[in-house]
Amino acid sequence: MKILTHNMMACTKKQCMGKGFPLKVECTEQIVLEQEFNYEFTKNIYPKLDWAGIAEISKKFNIPIQLDTTKHSLEDEEFLKTLHSLLCNLKVITGSLTCPNCQRVYPIDKGIPNMLLREDEIYQDIKE
Amino acid sequence: MSRPEHIAPPEIFYDDVESKKYSSNSRIIEIQTKMAERAYELLAIPETAEGLMLLDIGCGSGISGDVISDAGHHWIGCDISQHMLDVAIDREVEGDVMLRDIGQGFPFRAGTFDGAISISAIQWLCNAEKSHHNPRKRLHTFFQSLFNVLTRGGKAILQFYPENSAQIEMITASALRCGFSGGLLIDFPNSSKAKKYFLVLFTGNNNIMPSAKGVDGAEEYEEEDDNEVKYSNRKRDRRRVTKSKGSAQHKTKDWIMNKKDRQRKQGREIKNDSKFSGRKRGPKF
């Protein structure tokens, strides 16, 4: 699971609607990819990012990045490059995701997050 | 045609063996790639656009995702079969995949994706696999969640194999109820083999439905699927020829003797062999 995916994800249990993100990452194994910097993509994805999620990842993996959104400039190539490598090059292989709202833990195995809900959790949704 | 959704639920049907087919069977790969290419074409992403974020629903081993990667976009895929996703990881697909039942909606923040494609997945939602499943409710959750995760002006192209017209109606009605506009597009409506159903959905209103391929039936023969029909015709012709050759040997002396032996073994009452058995009759006057 890339950090980009993590940034887009949210817990979908009904009680977490609108507040089930950013998911907390626990990571026991990770790899670093080497993908080419893609200017267009980084620019397109920028407005969709959740900065609370970026902040957490930046702290967790010790990657310094400008977090003050008022100081960002899409002309600053250095900043975009850091952002791109944070989003696309860091991949969590094993670990888990925890919802900040309901504390549900989603395991990550072989790079695939398991987001399946159990029957009782869906039922919970229907009731509410 | 056999329907896998009648055999077992998707997470069980696409087991180790069935998933491996998707990485090794060139025919499956070719068909899937063709459909994904068509779906991507229907998304009508302008050629200048690059680096968009797309969702692949029921991504499986990531064949359809490869089409997106080739076009220079990023994708995230959801699938319910662990084995299929393992194949995707083995193939080192560029996008990210996750295990998720699409009938439970998507685990993403609202307005994340610029578009979505799905190849042969949503017909699975029409079946109740577990006691607590309700197809209508699951379809509703699916479309509602899809509507949420798409940006305004986003499009979703969902290719599926409906079992009957009731299913088409159930799926389309559910999509429209969730706020989508758009409708069903049928490629090659007059061909039983090349016929493909695409559900074209827009989150905005001001969109023009793309036109279907092969409506007048003339174009149809350009399709790969129909080449195959020609080939199988040839095969059938060849079979017919060998059969007629067989009937030429029919009623020769050897054939008659063989037949009498066979029937004797079956215990039937058979005339004794004589010098006249199987002999050619003289010319008739």
Question: Which stretches of residues belong to each language-model region?
Answer:
Chain B
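Conserved class I S-adenosyl-L-methionine
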Residues: 1-49
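Class I SAM-dependent methyltransferase SAM/SAH-binding core
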Residues: 53-105
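A short acidic, Gly/Pro-enriched loop at the edge of an enzyme's catalytic core
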Residues: 103-116
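A short beta-strand submotif of the Rossmann-like class I SAM-dependent methyltransferase core
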Residues: 118-121
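A short glycine-rich, Lys/Arg-flanked "PGG" loop and its adjoining helix->strand segment in the class I
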Residues: 134-152
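Conserved beta-strand signature within the Rossmann-like core of class I S-adenosyl-L-methionine
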Residues: 153-160
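Conserved S-adenosyl-L-methionine
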Residues: 180-191
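C-terminal lobe and adjacent flexible extensions of AdoMet/dcAdoMet transferase-like proteins
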Residues: 195-285
